[in-house]
Regions:
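Conserved beta-strand positions in repeat-built beta-propeller and related beta-rich domains
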Residues: 1, 50, 56-62, 98, ...
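Beta-rich, blade/repeat-based domains predominating
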Residues: 1, 26-55, 86-103, 133-149, ...
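Surface loops at the rim/top face of extracytoplasmic beta-rich domains
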Residues: 1-27, 31, 57-63, 67
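Structural signal for beta-propeller blades
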Residues: 2-5, 64-67, 112-114, 161-162, ...
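Beta-propeller blade signature
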Residues: 4-8, 168-181
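Short loop/turn segments immediately following beta-strands, especially the blade-tip
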Residues: 7-20, 69-76, 118-123, 179-181
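Beta-propeller fold detector
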Residues: 15-33, 77-85, 123-130
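Oxyanion-binding "anion nests"
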Residues: 46-73, 77
Length: 181
């Protein structure tokens, strides 16, 4: 089980926060389960972002399902629903909301790809490449993505888990850049 917890700034400034085990902790706002994956491992929630309306999104590394969490005015959870479940998105690692384009970019570590998710949950591919060492700037298991000006900066993890396109460790070419329009 993967979880998302919510803490006030006041609580954090007071020092160490001790959590209660399992679902007993009042800070717990969402939990997610993943079945054993087709890659032969267990994986869970990975990546978190918020849109311009204050909705929170997370993806599941193990199966690519994205969830959308909405909030009441007092900050409590209003809903936690599946936002995307698409055969074209089988792995969510880092995710980034681009306010200028009103889309979410997803690092698909399994397929060496960056996916684009529209606010109505449609998935398209921005970039995908074969298993490379990254020396030419191509992706080598992207794990985080962000947009800076007219560039998308991608951090590469380069960890050869079974079932991923990335099959071996390479020299540390850790960043890739895609020029945006």
């Amino acid at each position: 089980t993967s979880c998302i917890y919510q803490f006030s700034l006041d609580e954090m400034n007071r020092g160490t926060i001790k959590l209660k085990p399992g679902k007993a902790d009042s800070h717990l706002i969402a939990d997610f389960k993943t079945a054993y994956t087709n890659r032969g491992d267990w994986a869970g929630a990975d990546g978190i972002t918020m849109d311009s309306k204050g909705n929170l999104y997370t993806g599941n590394f193990g199966n690519g399902v994205m969830s959308k969490i909405t909030f009441n005015d007092d900050g409590t959870v209003k809903s936690n629903k599946v936002f995307v479940q698409d055969k074209g998105l089988t792995c969510c690692d880092g995710i980034f909301y681009d306010a200028a384009k009103n889309v979410i970019y997803v690092s698909d570590s399994e397929k060496n790809a960056i996916r684009v998710v529209s606010m109505d949950g449609k998935v398209t591919t921005l970039s995908e490449n074969a298993d490379t060492n990254g020396a030419d700037g191509s992706m080598d298991q992207p794990c985080e993505v962000l947009v800076r000006g007219n560039e998308m900066v991608i951090s590469n993890f380069d960890m050869p888990f079974p079932g991923l396109k990335n099959t071996k460790f390479d020299a540390p070419y850790t960043l890739s850049v895609i020029k945006m329009k």
